[in-house]
Amino acid sequence: LCQARMARLVYVSSVDALCLPERNEPVREPQRFFPEKLSTEYGRSKAESANMVLEAAKGGLSASVVLPSCILGPGDARRGFTSIMLQAYLRGIPPVSITGGYDFVDVRDVAQGILAACLTPGGSVYLLTGRYGSVKEVFDCLADYTGRPRTRLTLPLELLYPVLPFVSLYGAVTRRRMPLSSSALKLLAAHPLYDHSRATRELGFMPRPLEETVRDTAAFLLGRSVRS
């Protein structure tokens, strides 16, 4: 459809479509994706779709692929995984933190990156990532914003695996989306180092501080005004 109308296509994929290096090395944009090496259906579908877009770009379609990390920020009306996790903490659940973390990026910065990618030559792949933040760091930022005491107890991720079946059952019974799953724990256990320098160089992508993103997300979840 885009090719027929001479339109520009920017496919929003995910860093979950990437194969992480075995060593602690920077992760950069690939020339192609390898869905067969990924463990989750979500990652495989994103990788396969990205390959289709890149193949179409070789055939003349003006298209690019962007790879956001874990998107956080105000305006999440549907309450994704990260918003559910933050909202649970704001309600006092859980009273403890867990080890692990992830690379978080602000939704407003991702939107600006997508708009900038619309103006670039086709066939490009861009990492739209922020920086790594531990779960405890995010919870501490929430505590400081709300004036609550910081959590003192941090549990290892390994202790959560035995309770996953009960969490899943509770979610099914209450028809609620639960923030914990085996795939979520695996992501939190990894420590990827994404290199978004190409997006900075070619798109002017400059992600804002994680602390600002967490504060603005909390303000949105609490019904307070948020700066754009």
Labelled PLM ranges:
Residues A17-C19, L61-T82:
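Flexible, glycine-rich beta-alpha linker
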Residues L20, K37-L67:
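Active-site Tyr-X1-5-Lys
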Residues F33-K37, I84-V105, D109:
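A conserved pocket-lining segment of Rossmann-fold NAD(P)-dependent short-chain dehydrogenase/reductase
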Residues G113-M178, H196, L210, V214-S228:
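Mid/C-terminal beta-alpha module of Rossmann-like enzyme folds, strongest
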Residues P94-I98, F104-D109, L157-E202:
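A hydrophobic C-terminal alpha-helical subdomain
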Residues E48, R79-F81, I98-C118, S124:
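Substrate-positioning beta->alpha
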Residues L1-T40:
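Conserved Rossmann-fold NAD(P)-dependent oxidoreductase catalytic core, especially the SDR/UDP-sugar
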